[in-house]
Amino acid sequence: KKYIALVLVAVLVLGIFTGCGNKGNKETESQTDEKATESVNSAENNTEDSTQNSTENQNVADTEQLTTENGQESSVLACPSVNGKLHVEGSKLVDQNNNEVQLRGVSTHGLAWYPQYVTNDCFATLKSFGANVVRLAMYTYESGGYCTDGDRQRLETLVQNGVQYALNNDMYVIIDWHVLNEGNPNRYSDVAKTFFAKMAQQYASYNNVIYEICNEPCNGATWGDVKFYASEVIPSIRSYDKDAVILIGTPNWSQDVDEAVKDPVTGYDNIMYTLHFYAATHKEDLQNKLKSAADAGLPIFVSEFGICSADG
């Protein structure tokens, strides 16, 4: 797989091989295959040896020192038992000792549609592949969505189980409020505030939980809309969890990171901004946009990427 690597920027890449919605020209998300993802927070392409067996991946990958193409040391793959709770320093994702870290793993598809993959065995298998993070994609609007006709208790239980399975396997986990077809995250902001307050209260003492408060603002949602939403939801998390990393989606299906550069969220630490990239659809213009934002010092977290087209 190929991914974007930029100098001096903490980038988490979660690559998804099924469509998760149209960015720029997509209309709906495919509800077919589970998404595979990969994350990076490195200065150059990861050159780790692909010949390691699964046992070595499980026992070594979490603390493995990565190198860049010129042989210089880069960030390390992280695990909660060694690296503890993560935070943001400048544009970088770092561990409890301020060492740059790398996360890479998978994102589920909609929890309501594919609950059978939220098991300890699945997480253990992902761990054996070298994954150290799982993104729990909980749709909010679509069929079975948390804010529409979904069973909220069932969805919360799936999230809670996922957090525990990640902890069991020494992995990080992202609780993803998967805004998509509703477009503007403010539509269900009151529900989001209640949900994230509940999650943060439950997991404030955990060192492996990251919150993603809006997957893909779209359909005309502006950065002003997203920033207002963030100002409403972030306090619900910070009331209980003072320093967890919080990810904020950007307009245009999380492509317009340049908007966040011009007017970032202020008053809170450990904030990152998401960018989504699909190689068959998004070309050099999006890479240039990412590079410009990174050069400006924006903490960027690529919470979805795929080698397919944006519409699956």
Feature-to-residue mapping (PLM):
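Extracellular glycoside hydrolase catalytic/binding regions
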Residues: 85-86, 110, 115, 132, ...
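N-terminal, intrinsically disordered, polar/charged segments of Gram-positive cell-envelope systems
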Residues: 24-79
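Aromatic-lined substrate-binding rim segments of carbohydrate-active enzymes
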Residues: 118-182, 189-194, 238-240
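N-terminal carbohydrate-binding accessory modules
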Residues: 60-133, 149
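Repetitive helical segments and hydrophobic/amphipathic motifs
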Residues: 10-11
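Bacterial N-terminal signal peptides that target proteins for export
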Residues: 1-7
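C-terminal motif of bacterial Sec signal peptides marking the signal peptidase cleavage site
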Residues: 15-19
